[in-house]
Amino acid sequence: MAFVPKTLDYTVSPYTGLTRQSWIEAGTYLLEGVFQNIAHFEDPVVMPRKETKVTYPHSADAVWEFKAEYFEGLARSFFIAAPLIHDNPDLNLCGYSIRDYYKSHVLRACTKGDPVSVGRYEELQEMAGDYNRAFQQTVETCALVICLWVCKEEIWDTYTKKEKDVIAEFLRGYADGNTVPQNWRLFNMLDMAFLDMEGYEIDEEIMLDHAQSILAYYAGDGWYRDGHSFDYYSCWAFNVYAPIWNLWYGYEKQPYIAAKFEEHSNKLMETYADFFDRDGFTNMWGRSNIYRNAATSAFDGNLMLHNSTADPGLARRISSGSLLQFMTRDDFLFKGVPTLGFYGQFTPLVQGYSCAESPFWLGKAFLCLHLPADHPFWTAIENNGTWETLGSKDTKVTSLNGPALCFSNHQANGETILRTGKVVKNKKDEHGMWNYSKLCFNTKYPWESAVASDIEAQQYVLYDGVSDEIKKGNVTYWHGLKNDVLYRRQFFNYDLENECHWIQAINLADFTVPYGVIRADKLRLFSCPIRLTLGSYGFPDNGTQIIEKTADGAKAIILKGHDHTGREKQMAMTIYDGWDELEIVKSTGTNPDSENSIVIYAKTAREKKYGYQPYVLISQVITKESLEDFTDDEIFPIEKVHYTDTKKCGGYGPVTITLKDGTTRTIDFEGIEGQLIR
């Protein structure tokens, strides 16, 4: 059953109607789902498990994994519970005092020998037999200390000195212990900052080493590099934990680093609101998408700073819009608990480091409830930022060279499209390519997994006739935006064993139109024969009308239908020069919105090894949230294509595309070779 808010106020919240009380109702709704699965007060937060092949615990004898699962359930659900406990210490759900439950289980989790102990750091080292290993528990200690801070008066302050010492000793092992050299360093930093704040001695050299490392991961534009990739960890980790660290430790003891963290968060706020669409929807992109609207927690992180620049009315509008995106769907929960998916259960999305309780990381979005009722986040009138300034067919494009992110806000359909670069994935990591290597990510068309071995949504797939292999784009270099055209290069089956000239590739060039994106990509092949396909977005198939059209040598397929919620959907894909055919493929179990789906795909082939054959591939995908017909000019927008080369293959020189509305875009790959960044 979907969440339905009881409290609505369209005066202060004209877009969503949600208020602070609405958020309390939403948090209570989620906690009721948790506690309906807890049979006895003594039982840990272990939830019903729907998926068993990918997620952990992976085997019945993996004791440390069960302990990690206990801790994930406790600490992540505490994200939701802590602000509710602070707001209402007498909260009682399913017959349990929520304050008493978390007070008891936090202490028990930290107590050696207790049946629900999650394992001290030293115990796990001995159990694993690896003294250089980091453990999942380190992640959860950070959630624990944040929540103990949020409801400090109700839980932490009520422990005896002896009980506090037990918890502090437990935390110290992870605070000083091994971590992963990426966002995990912030977990250790907050553990130490909490201990320091509560009067316990810490190793300040360890703190400073982690802090300087985090600072060094900064790539610009408010984004941090996490591992190799850029993703929402920059938002729900770096730009949430760093502001909290500033409050607890940095402003007082490391003012230079704290000032930098503040500067970076404020830089993110300059553009981050435009990462979401007109409805406040979060885009399905990057790993750990089961955390869903946790992406909005970066706004709350910024509002904690001494010199915050976030627009509170816009921040709440987006946070509430994203909350409704997920919680109002009838497939969001499994037995009262958020599924391992983006909407309903969707296994292609799930990583092996997750368990049934992992989705409660979305509880970070509820940390905004720590802001008092009179805070501007709750009192400012909702506004919709960029969307209030765009004309009916306007598109705003933001390109960030630091993290290699280009996102466009399309007023015509209310969608936001993300195009990314600096992507490096192993050529066998199909899952990683779905998360990062799609050519476009759309807030209203979440990415589709493989519908066939040689067809992918929003990806090129190349069959190499020489090696007899199907190859996919696992590495994407970034050049950036030039004269309204975004340039990138994608390699197929990139590896370090071969120089790049021995790897099949395609130069990417794309630009926005009101309802989507036009592509004018150029093949960069070292050998033929090859076959190539390019898929549209995945389209939810709940009864779909399929229409085919042709005009002036171009071909289009239009799909009309509805998504799982009944929302009207329409998509059209059009092919021009360089392509041979346009077809559809139907699929089951590959779409995160609906069980059945359709992908439109273009296909072509190149046979002659060194033939001067068409190099440029021109196509368009447009979408709208309506069954109202696209106009012919929207489906077939190109008036003419002018080539520099006399054979009109696009082998050299600029290619100029003139649209029927008079817009011209010049595609010119000259000069990008020396300015490609990964």
Q: Where are the predicted features?
A:
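Extended repeat-based interaction scaffolds and adjacent low-complexity, acidic/S/T/P-biased segments
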Residues: 440, 454-678
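Low-complexity, Ser/Thr/Pro/Gly-enriched N-terminal "stalk/linker" regions
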Residues: 2-72, 100-105, 114-115
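Carbohydrate-active enzyme catalytic cores, enriched for enzymes
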Residues: 113-126, 167, 277-284, 290-428
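Short linear interaction motifs
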Residues: 52-62, 343-346, 384-390, 501-503
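Low-complexity, glycine/alanine/valine/leucine- and proline-rich hydrophobic stretches
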Residues: 387, 391-476
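Aromatic-lined, polymer-binding surfaces characteristic
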Residues: 70-71, 79-91, 95-300
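Mature N-terminal, pre-catalytic/accessory segment of carbohydrate-active enzymes
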Residues: 1-2, 678
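Composition- and surface-driven signal marking solvent-exposed, interaction-prone regions
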Residues: 256-257, 287, 311-318, 375-382, ...
